[in-house]
Amino acid sequence: MRILWIVAVCLIGVEGNLFQFAKMINGKLGAFSVWNYISYGCYCGWGGQGTPKDATDRCCFVHDCCYGRVRGCNPKLAIYSYSFKKGNIVCGKNNGCLRDICECDRVAANCFHQNKNTYNKNYRFLSSSRCRQTSEQC
């Protein structure tokens, strides 16, 4: 399933929300950093279950919950406006669900940056068998 997320990013090309989210992550953490989060822990990548493994994985759990609250458009495909100002992500003048999606992505990218010291390479490409605990509620 997590491979589907990688394929989705590649298929979207230079447009679409997942690409924008990837650009936010790279903007906060450095070029190509997004690859560190595509399949990490129990929640970073496609789907998610169990208990987040660390603060980095919890960023993904919270992001999944945030997307789950968005109504009126597809969070993985909708295109919103944002920019970087002095290293900070600033969501543009988006309305409704576009504003909500941008905020979900902004908060997650900042969360990755704030918790980069918790990143554990042992949680990359973690087997789903290590995420079988009962999932937390959002």
From Swiss-Prot:
GO biological process per UniProt: arachidonate secretion; lipid catabolic process; negative regulation of T cell proliferation; phospholipid metabolic process
Domain of life: Eukaryota
Family statement drawn from the similarity comment of this UniProt entry: Belongs to the phospholipase A2 family. Group II subfamily. D49 sub-subfamily.
Cofactor note: Binds 1 Ca(2+) ion.
Location of this chain's protein in the cell: Secreted
Subunit structure: Heterodimer of a weakly toxic basic protein having phospholipase A2 activity (B chain (AC Q8JFG1)) and a non-toxic acidic protein functioning as its inhibitor (A chain).
EC number in record: 3.1.1.4
Keywords, alphabetical: Calcium, Disulfide bond, Hydrolase, Lipid degradation, Lipid metabolism, Metal-binding, Neurotoxin, Postsynaptic neurotoxin, Presynaptic neurotoxin, Secreted, Signal, Toxin
Gene Ontology terms, MF aspect: calcium ion binding; calcium-dependent phospholipase A2 activity; phospholipid binding; toxin activity
Source species: Vipera aspis aspis (Aspic viper)
Ligand binding (Ca(2+)): 43, 45, 47, 64
Reactions this protein catalyses: a 1,2-diacyl-sn-glycero-3-phosphocholine + H2O = a 1-acyl-sn-glycero-3-phosphocholine + a fatty acid + H(+)
Protein name, per record: Basic phospholipase A2 vaspin B chain
List of catalytic residues: 63, 105
Principal location: secreted
Cofactor: Ca(2+)
Tissue and organ distribution: Expressed by the venom gland.
InterPro entries associated with the record: PLipase_A2 (IPR001211), PLipase_A2_Asp_AS (IPR033112), PLipase_A2_dom (IPR016090), PLipase_A2_dom_sf (IPR036444), PLipase_A2_His_AS (IPR033113)
TM regions (residue ranges): none
